[in-house]
Amino acid sequence: MTPAVAAPPPPRSTNPVVRITEDLRRERAVGVPFPPGDTRFSMARTMGFLRDPLTLLLGAYERYGPVFTLRVFHQNVVFMLGPAANHYILVSDAANFSWRDGHYHDLIPFLGDGLLSIDGDFHWQSRRAMLPMFHRERIAASQKLMVDEVEAAMDRWHDGMRVDVYAWTRELALRIAMRALFGMDPDRATARHDAAHEFEEALGFWSKDYILQLMRGPGTPWARMQAARRNLDEIVYAELTRRRASGEHGDDLLGLLLDTQDGDGLTLSDRHIRDQVMTLMFAGHDTTTSTVAFLFYELARNPGLADAADFDLDLAVDETLRLYPPAWVGPRRSVAPFEFAGVAVPGGVPVEYSSWASHHLPDVWDEPFAFKPERFAPGRREQLPKGAYVPFGGGSRTCIGMRFGQAEIGVIARAILRRFRLDLEPGYRMHVRQMPTIGPKHGLPVTVRASAPAAGLEPATALVA
């Protein structure tokens, strides 16, 4: 009998009362002080964390330094900010921090045991199985597909047309993922509608107020998310069954996972494949869509930048990811006690780093709230300290789809800039939502203007060398 892939530990209860009670029990069991900070419950602080966590975290950094405690929701959380803190958590002492026990655990009921929510051998084994799909050569081969999809979508644009770039990119990114990663035909109406509708329905759970997320029962956001998950499962499992029956697994991510065997003869179960599919759809979908929207928001706020002779789109994308890193917080739980920057941190407590806050520290970045792509120019990027710039995480947990996402963002942005300028709708104000990733809360409504190509743009197909 073929042995199964290494199994993850069982997830915690999805009952919010049980989970909150367990969190409080674990906190009482710590028995030693938390780092300095604001450790008494405050509704104002909790609401501030929900509405504007960046301001809250930067203020605490000024008061307490790079390691501090904030009581948000029902428990104390240790935050560690700055380049050295990021490097410590992501690279030098990464083994002392559990992902599965951080608050990304909240995603397990939808995503399952994908790369975001697993640790140890199970994470390493799963990541190794998928790495070939994200080699540079495979991504380069996917670029023509990306270009075809983008050009077809843009052929419907015309001068003076109003477009929500965020919504437009969400549809486009889903089509690209369906074709490039999963070999599914997005023009098969049932597949496209079902996948897109159910995926958006599921993600809508995390956009609801926190109190609504805690509710259970018919008609609640939780019930709608679970129904969407079941419908998505039917789509994925049906495709896996079809491929196994035909004997043709395909040359995409699904086929790669179906064919996977490691040196010990371990294979991946359908459930494991499903969990990785959902996780990659979630991570890649929101990263691409939000970054493209924020990029064109900043270009519209800085008129003439894209027309400058020295404009470099890659630098502009890097700067966009600095200002708006999609995965803005990295939740963990410490395995054992440790000391950082002279501050003792207990074992068994929530510990989080924040790329968003670290990317806005004035002692690291000149004019941290300004859009300045030149800060990533050759010679300047190398001067950044380790851990200063971490939009895709770092170490063994660096986003596996980073190159695919960068290629996709580049193809979409180059195609737009070669044909159009996007002007913000009068009176538009950007409101950033934080959950489950950073994105424009109210989309990005623009007016499309026909334009000469922006300066310095190489063809999209030259992006991946």
Residue ranges of each PLM-predicted region?
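N-terminal membrane-proximal hinge/A-helix region immediately C-terminal to the signal-anchor transmembrane segment
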Residues: 2-125, 144-152, 187, 228, ...
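Cytochrome P450 heme-thiolate monooxygenase catalytic core
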Residues: 2-12, 16-31, 99-104, 122, ...
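Cytochrome P450 proximal C-terminal region
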Residues: 2-12, 18, 30, 61, ...
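Conserved cytochrome P450 K-helix E-x-x-R motif and the immediately C-terminal K′/meander segment
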Residues: 45-65, 238, 310-343, 362
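Cytochrome P450 catalytic-core helices
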Residues: 287-307, 403-420
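Conserved cytochrome P450 K-helix/beta-meander segment immediately N-terminal to the heme-binding cysteine loop
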Residues: 353-381
